[in-house]
C-alpha cells in the first residue's frame, strides 16, 4: 500500500482506491495534478503498524543562466569592514578594561582582552575588533557606555 503526500495533504490508501467522482482529494482531479513534487510513502503490508519510508522527491533542477549569476553577485554587497579602536585613559583600572571588553565583545577571551588592554596602555590605542559598520558602532557605544574611550574608523587594511 502507498500513501500519496502532496504539499501538506496526505491521502490515505482508502481515499485513493475508494474515492468518489466528486471527492475534492481525488488524485486525478485533486490539488496534486499541477504540483512538481509528489512523494510517496511506502508503508508496511499491515495498515496502522510500523512506519514508512519516504522515497526521494522528484525535483526539477534548473541551472541559472550566466546573466542571473552575475545579477546575484551584484545584489550581494559586502559591507566594508570597520575597526573599533580602544584608546588609553588614565582613570580606568586595567582589570576593569579587561572585564568590559569581555562583556561587550562577543567571543572575547581573557587573553585577547588582556593583550588589547596592554597594547592600548603602551601604544595609546589598540584595535579591538574589525566588523561591519553597524556592529562596530554598536560595540563602540557599548564601550563608551561602560566608561572606556573608543572610536570607529574604516579598516584600510594597512598596518
Curated annotation (Swiss-Prot):
Transit peptide start-stop = 1-44
Location comes to: Plastid, Chloroplast stroma
GO (cellular component) term, any one:
chloroplast stroma
Out of the domains of life, which is the source? Eukaryota
Phenotype caused by lack of the gene: No visible phenotype. Weak chloroplast phenotype under short-day conditions.
Tell me which tissues or organs this protein is expressed in: Expressed exclusively in photosynthetic green tissues with high levels in young, developing leaf tissues.
Predominant place of localization: plastid
A Gene Ontology biological process term? protein catabolic process
Cross-referenced Pfam families: ClpS
Q: Give GO terms: molecular function aspect only.
A: peptidase activity; protein-macromolecule adaptor activity
SUPFAM superfamilies, per database record: ClpS-like
User: Keywords of this protein's UniProt record, alphabetized?
Assistant: Chloroplast, Hydrolase, Plastid, Protease, Transit peptide
| Function, in words | Small adapter protein that modulate the activity of CLPC. Involved in plastid biogenesis in particular when chloroplast protein synthesis capacity is a limiting factor. Probably involved in substrate selection for plastid Clp protease system. Recruitment to ClpC chaperones is facilitated by CLPF thus forming a binary adapter for selective substrate recognition and delivery to plastid Clp protease system (CLPC).
Question: Its quaternary structure?
Answer: Interacts with CLPC1 (via N-terminus) and CLPC2, but not with CLPt1 or CLPT2. Binds to ClpF; this interaction stimulates their association with ClpC.
Give the record's family classification: Belongs to the ClpS family.
Protein's UniProt name: ATP-dependent Clp protease adapter protein CLPS1, chloroplastic
* High-level lineage: Eukaryota, Viridiplantae, Streptophyta, Embryophyta, Tracheophyta
Gene name on record?
Answer: CPLS1
